[in-house]
Every structure is written in structure tokens, then in C-alpha cells.
């Protein structure tokens, strides 16, 4: 079975938000990696910030975004007490794409084994914005971006615009 073809190249405006109590713009390797991979794929990065792992900061950042098609959060998806990104984002999503988390954990399992069960990576739609939430690990970010997000970003945004 072949996927149906897309209409052609579209402009995709992205935001990158790192959720961390310890990272700075100098030490945020995963946030920088996401931006670089987006730019290498000819995707615009219109917004980048680092916020604390506080549910109110996470939800207010998502609610305040304008003129953004895709937002990629990284950090705070595990099960430690301060890992609140999943819960904050999941509470706002209008629709979820469970296949993203399922495939991400499957691909992670191939690389790191059973520790993949601790990941709460998620994807969904909030007010017509495609939202991804990834672990803070640069290896996890690279895996998600290269194998899942970048190959499908244009198609998913096209679906939201249809």
C-alpha cells in the first residue's frame, strides 16, 4: 500500500521549546539539534525558548503561539516527579496521534532496549497546531526528527490545512 501523494512543497513555520530546569541557550544541545534539523530540511524556525518544567509555563507557551504550524517540545517526558510536559500538553490536545508515541517507543526499543517504556513522547493537535513532545536526550531527538517528524511534517500540516 502506497501513501497518497501530497500536493507539493508548503511553508511550515515551527517553534522549538525546551523544557528544563537546568538548560541554558548555551547548553541546550537538543533544542539546538531540533532547530538545525528543521533548517536543514528547509523548515522555518520562528520561535525558540527554554522554559522551566512547570505545567503552567508549558501550557501558557503553547496557548500563546501565533503563526506557528508545528511546535516541538523537548524535555520532561519521563516519569520523574519534575517531568510534567506530557501531562500539561495532553490536557490541551484536541486530537492525539497515538501512532507517533507507539512508533517512537518501538524505534527507541531497537536502540536502548526495554528502557523505552519510560518514554511518554506524544503528538497531537492543539487549535490546528501540530504538537510534538520529545525526550530531552539528543539521541532521542535525532531519532524522532529523522525517522518520524521530518518525513511526515509536510503531510500532517497539509492535512490540518485541508
What are these regions (language model features)?
Residues 1-162:
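Non-catalytic beta/alpha edge segments that cap or flank active sites
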